[in-house]
Regions:
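Extracellular glycan-recognition modules
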Residues: 3-61, 93-96, 159-164
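Extracellular glycan-interaction patches encoded by glycine-rich segments
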Residues: 124-150
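Extended recognition patches within non-cytosolic domains
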Residues: 2-3, 94-96, 101, 110-115, ...
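Short, aromatic/His-centered strand-loop micro-motif at the edge of beta-sheets
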Residues: 62-84
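Short tryptophan-centered beta-strand motifs in secreted/extracellular beta-sheet-rich domains
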Residues: 23, 80-91, 102
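Beta-strand-rich interaction surfaces with strong enrichment in secreted/lumenal proteins
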Residues: 9-11, 71-77, 121-123
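Extracellular beta-rich ligand/substrate-recognition surface
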Residues: 1-5, 45, 62-69, 113-115
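Beta-strand-rich, repetitive solenoid scaffolds
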Residues: 9, 39-41, 50-55, 61-65, ...
Length: 211
């Protein structure tokens, strides 16, 4: 799956300051330069490039063109495990540390090797009228492919959400598991990719027809 990715260019802009990305991922190649979950690109700038990925040291990382926004201390090296990754963004938040939040398997990440909070009101290329890509760092057709498996990739345009919208703890096993999001306002460019249709892997199940 190293070279598989999906790309969409929205016809109209949504909220470039507030959004939530959720994805279930299972890694297969460790120590890759980058292993990208979601990216968007319009220009070589902070506002123009956004990449949610695992870095070459297997840390979860959010980077813009020239700034690493968040990089975890935690390493993600279990190739047998599914990780539920949530990146929740709201740059209008008055508390700087709440402008970008990472959650893994329902628990917020709080230990970071790098933290550069976005400025208040910072815009990103996410939800803008430029390429939005799942599984590749889309400033290049060969950069930072996911090298793993992905399931239930979702993006909610206009809301900074908790992981409990997309997952829940199993009452018997105590394991964090998928929960179908319901009652959501997905926003202009929101989508939910289940990857259930092999003939149309980019089929949007959110009801927004953002295929």
């Amino acid at each position: 799956m190293a070279n598989s990715y999906l790309v969409r260019t929205p016809g109209s802009a949504g909220n470039t300051k507030k959004f939530t990305i959720s994805a279930w991922v299972k890694r297969s190649l460790l120590g890759s330069t980058y292993s990208t979950i979601f990216s968007s690109w319009s220009a070589d700038s902070i506002a123009g490039h956004f990449a949610l990925r695992f870095d070459g040291s297997d840390r979860l990382d959010l980077s813009t063109w020239s700034v690493n926004v968040l990089t975890t201390n935690r390493l993600f090296r279990d190739t047998s495990a599914w990780y539920h990754i949530v990146c929740a963004v709201d740059t209008d938040e008055s508390t700087a540390d709440n402008r970008v939040r990472f959650y893994v398997n329902g628990v917020e990440e709080t230990s970071f090797s790098t933290r550069n909070n976005p400025s208040s009101g910072q815009t990103f290329s996410v939800n803008n009228t430029n390429s939005q890509t799942v599984g590749l760092n889309n400033y290049s057709s060969t950069a930072g492919s996911m090298d793993g498996y992905m399931s239930h990739v979702a993006m909610v345009d206009g809301q900074q959400l908790a992981p409990t919208v997309f997952g829940q703890t199993d009452s018997t096993s105590g394991i964090w598991k998928f929960k179908s999001p319901s009652g959501l306002s997905w926003g202009t460019n929101g989508f939910h990719l289940k990857f259930e249709n092999s003939a149309n892997l980019g089929l949007d199940s959110s009801g927004q027809t953002n295929n």
